[in-house]
Design a protein with these regions (language model features):
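Beta-strand cores of secreted/periplasmic/IMS beta-sandwich domains, seen most often
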Residues: 53-70, 92-101, 105
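Short, solvent-exposed loop/turn elements at domain surfaces
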Residues: 47-49, 72-75
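Extracellular/periplasmic metallocenter environments
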Residues: 2-9, 15-34, 88-127
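Short histidine
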Residues: 70-72, 112
């Protein structure tokens, strides 16, 4: 192979590599954050209506709307600073937070009697 042919081949490979890098990332921008609302209904036995796993992606806004037949507090582990929902029997209560940590986090109900039970989970995927 001549020096000229070698140079043309090297330039072609470099251009193809650059085009791959440019077009590989084009059109794959992450979806913008979403607002997600989940409705849960609780009774003495735990979750009776609503999803057991509340799914989100980093940056999403999550609203949890809860109706319970007993008093207590609902909170999301690792997100205590963001969401604590005080529950009154028969009344709708809600809390909102931004999913700022990826992972799976338990949603726990602490009853007025001190009972502590997981009723659902928040699962946050990386963006």
């Amino acid at each position: 192979m001549t020096a000229r042919a070698l140079a043309v081949t090297a330039i072609t490979v470099a251009l193809l590599g650059a085009m791959y890098i440019v077009f590989r990332t084009a059109g794959h921008a992450p979806a913008p954050p979403q607002s997600r609302t989940y409705r849960l209904r609780l009774d003495d036995h735990g979750l009776t209506s609503g999803p057991a796993v509340l799914e989100a992606v980093l940056g999403d806004s999550i609203t949890i709307v809860v109706t319970s037949n007993r008093a207590g507090t609902l909170h999301v582990h690792e997100y205590e600073q963001h969401i604590v929902i005080d529950l009154e029997p028969g009344r709708e209560s809600s809390g909102r937070f931004t999913a700022d940590r990826a992972g799976r986090f338990g949603v726990h109900l602490i009853g007025a009697d001190g009972a502590h039970a997981q009723v659902a989970a928040v699962e946050v995927q990386p963006r």
